[in-house]
Amino acid sequence: MIATMLLGATLQAAPLPPEVWKERNRPDMPVLPPCDLGGGATIAHSIKGLPADVVSELTRFFDAAIPMSDAGGPFNSTDVVDGPVPNRRFLRAYQAGRYWVIWYELGGFVSGPRTIALHRNPARGNGASTFRMAPGTAFAGDLCIATKAILAGVRSASS
């Protein structure tokens, strides 16, 4: 019994050194150039700057159990599961017309910057409108080009 406990203690992973933990769970924010979408577009640099119904739809879509980290927050950039650190991190969002285009980082094997757009549903009987994910708006790569494409009506085939 004691030998088993000693073997288990020996095989237990040592805590990550602080610099490794930081690189894996709190990597630096990417430097993103401004994206000129023309007049009337607004920008949010934090989830806190989004309307409540947009945040609610993001939470529903991405699973409330594993929320998206806010800009600059903890973010698991690798495919190694290491605690409750989210594998998505908000970068910024643009509102133009009926859309909020969300820029975020995805960690893991297929890591990198992504977009997803939410479109405003028409007002309901009580006058309130809601936002829903717009199908075909998940793009990777140059987020500004993707945002302009989404606003021009381009949709991806894989969504």
Predicted regions and their residues:
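Hydrophobic alpha-helical targeting segments used for export or membrane insertion
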Residues: 2-12
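Short loop/turn segments immediately following beta-strands, especially the blade-tip
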Residues: 120-126
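Short beta-strand elements that form the blades of beta-propeller/WD-repeat-like
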Residues: 99-105
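Flexible low-complexity loop/turn motifs enriched in small/helix-breaking residues
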Residues: 12-98, 134-159
